[in-house]
Amino acid sequence: MSAAICAGVLLASGTAARGDAGAVSWQAPTPAPGSVVGVAAGTKVTVQLAAASAVRTATIRIAPASKLPQGARLSVTPGNPARAELSWIPRGAQVGTHPLRFNAVDISAVPVSSQALSFQARVAPGTVKLSGLENVSRWAFVRRQMIVRAAPRASAYGKARLKAWTPEYYPNPVLALQERIDRNGTWVQVRLPILPNNSTGWVKRGALGDFRITRDHLVVDRAATRATLFRNGVAIFTTRVGVGTSYWPTPRGEFYITEKMSGFHNVAYGPIAFGTSARSAVLTDWPGGGYVGIHGTNAPRLIPGHVSHGCVRLRNASIVRLARLMGVGTPLTIH
């Protein structure tokens, strides 16, 4: 017999205790005495309890026999059978084992008849994937300057420093990969705009703004000199592009769009440009060098081809169309 559990796991089970004829007894789907209900921190668990008596006129009530864990709620429906539902979203600080004790009492009996029940909830550290499932990705703006850690704890090595603004003074976004909830708090693994490319690190959840969702994904094929934008896994835009030469290659890897800009004085960038988290160890067309941009051009005759210093060039009509479809935070794959 198993407990009715949402987003939890009954780690050890058996048969709920039953009393003598006429006495109160626990009924399915109540967890068995001594069983263990497993749940990850940050995930909701729901446990159903039921108790009954063979005496038809009995009125049973289920009540906690000890203090419930902080944040847990018990809703009770007296009767015969009586029912109760325990719901709880444990926090990271509650990782560990929590005893749960209840009494089922026949409040109509003289003397009062009752049956005790004890089992455990075991809270494990919770990790939730934020991007890459069912064509959904999540990103957020950086609220304040922070140190990015190599692991989800404050004592971990600092890998980089993230600022609230990009080098071009736009709000700085990060692509969120997964969220970790444990005794160290809530941490988010993010993709980093640093060398080496494809670097990731962990930041405190409070250092980021609200998560925003995108179902888009831009893929740049260097060999085919082609860029394709997918939405919900379906291609909605494709165009030929210019990419880096062998001396100044466009880097491969997993990146994201950091900013969308227009109004350049330099016509070489065309009418619109996107900043990305991709970096080049040598040079790019981007102001200041080092970052890989996606932008228009004043030399459309060179597209398609391996013609840039690392940036991805589109004909101006194509970059304008792409700008109508794609926003900041979009994942970018270059291969």
For each predicted feature, which ranges?
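Boundary regions of SH3-family modules and the immediately adjacent low-complexity/disordered segments
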Residues: 126-135, 191-220
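Extracellular/luminal low-complexity segments enriched in Ser/Thr/Pro
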Residues: 85-95
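Exported/periplasmic cell-wall-interacting domains
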Residues: 194, 207-217, 245-256, 261-335
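Surface-exposed or secretory-pathway low-complexity segments enriched in glycine-proline
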Residues: 24-30, 43, 47-83, 115-119
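Short, solvent-exposed loop/turn segments at the edges of extracellular beta-sandwich modules
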Residues: 105-111
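SH3/SH3-like beta-barrel superfamily modules
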Residues: 166-208
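Exposed beta-strand face motif in extracellular beta-rich ectodomains
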Residues: 96-100, 186
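Beta-loop motif signature
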Residues: 126-178
